[in-house]
A protein has these predicted regions:
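C-terminal motif of bacterial Sec signal peptides marking the signal peptidase cleavage site
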Residues: 18-23
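Bacterial N-terminal signal peptides that target proteins for export
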Residues: 2-11
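Mature, Sec-exported extracytoplasmic domains of Gram-positive
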Residues: 28-310
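Short amphipathic alpha-helical "recognition" segments used for binding
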Residues: 6-7, 24, 116-118
Length: 310
């Protein structure tokens, strides 16, 4: 495997190449390139890119997943979007798009946090109610839910011991579920929003069967992941008798890592697409606003300095 890490020096080289080409009569600015601009050259400049579903078209109502802001020094800041569309970018400068991205990112955090809180709170109440009911029956020795209408006196000693054992195990399980849910809810309640920070990115090339040509190119970077503990019940009214047999009917998901590595695979460039007064160019799943006469973008070649290959 042949690997080259994208370093600050490599980014500087890409920027220098861009300036050199511009001085030779071609403009290689991200927005106004007069010659096709390679991925490393484009990302090596200050620029704002839009990530969207690679299977979708660039259109006014198309949803935006993320906005990526490159600082020209080998770093990118990723902002998640909450229902933003390509139409929302119309008439905005890059700085205004970044401000919108910051607002959107916080909205994503707030929405996911609130959804987790709203789902987990009734789950805690329901589990607590079942636990309290079964605990009272266990402590008092009535075992009403477990008897399901039968008389306690009808049980053999062996049956009674088995019923006690079931209660004990179920109560232990419920207590563990309650503690996990309460701890998760407390962590979610105390979570505060932190604005995304610039992170280094790497580029990776996959070659074709000859090993000489680029088949695809991938950009990888760390990005915030807003994931919170969440408990969900199939039915908020859990029957204690059923819980003794089947357990709590529902599920829970643990909070994920605050930072997650993301990758976007780039294939052949897409044709320029116009939305209102904007012209977009880039790749399936990743585009930026350019001038109408922009020459487009291209994948890097396997011999490009600073890029991992295969």
């Amino acid at each position: 495997m042949k690997k080259r890490r994208l370093t600050a020096a490599a980014v500087a080289t890409a920027c220098l190449l861009t300036l050199t080409l511009a001085g030779c009569g071609g403009t290689n600015d991200v927005k106004s390139a007069s010659e096709p601009l390679a991925v490393s050259q484009a990302f090596g400049q200050e620029s704002v890119w839009v990530q969207y579903n690679e299977n979708d078209a660039i259109e006014k109502d198309g949803e935006i997943d993320r906005i990526l802001v490159f600082d020209g020094n080998g770093n990118v800041t990723a902002y998640q979007c909450d229902g933003a569309t390509f139409a929302d970018l119309n008439g905005k400068s890059d700085d205004e798009i970044v401000e919108m991205a910051k607002e959107q990112d916080k909205e994503v955090f707030d929405a996911k946090r609130q959804d987790a809180l709203d789902s987990t709170a009734p789950a805690i109440d329901s589990i607590q109610s079942v636990y309290d009911t079964l605990k009272d029956e266990y402590d008092s020795g009535t075992y009403t839910s477990g008897l399901r209408g039968s008389a306690l006196s009808d049980l053999t000693d062996a049956d009674l011991e088995q019923l006690k054992s079931i209660y004990s195990q179920v109560l232990t399980d419920l207590e563990a579920q309650l503690n996990a849910a309460k701890d998760g809810q407390a962590a979610t309640e105390s979570a505060t929003y932190q604005e995304p920070q610039a992170q280094p990115y790497t580029l990776h090339i996959e070659t074709d069967s000859t090993g000489n040509n680029t088949q695809s190119e991938t950009i990888s970077f760390d990005a915030p992941s807003y994931s919170f503990y969440k408990a969900q019940l199939d039915d908020e009214e859990q029957n204690p008798a059923d819980v003794l047999t089947w357990g709590i009917k529902g599920s829970s998901t643990e909070a994920g890592d605050a930072i997650r590595n993301e990758s976007i695979e780039l294939f052949s460039p897409v044709n320029k697409q116009t939305v209102y007064d904007m012209t977009f160019a880039g790749f399936s799943g990743l585009a930026t606003i350019v001038n109408e006469d922009h020459a487009g973008f291209m994948l890097d070649t396997p011999d490009t300095e600073g890029i991992e290959v295969d």
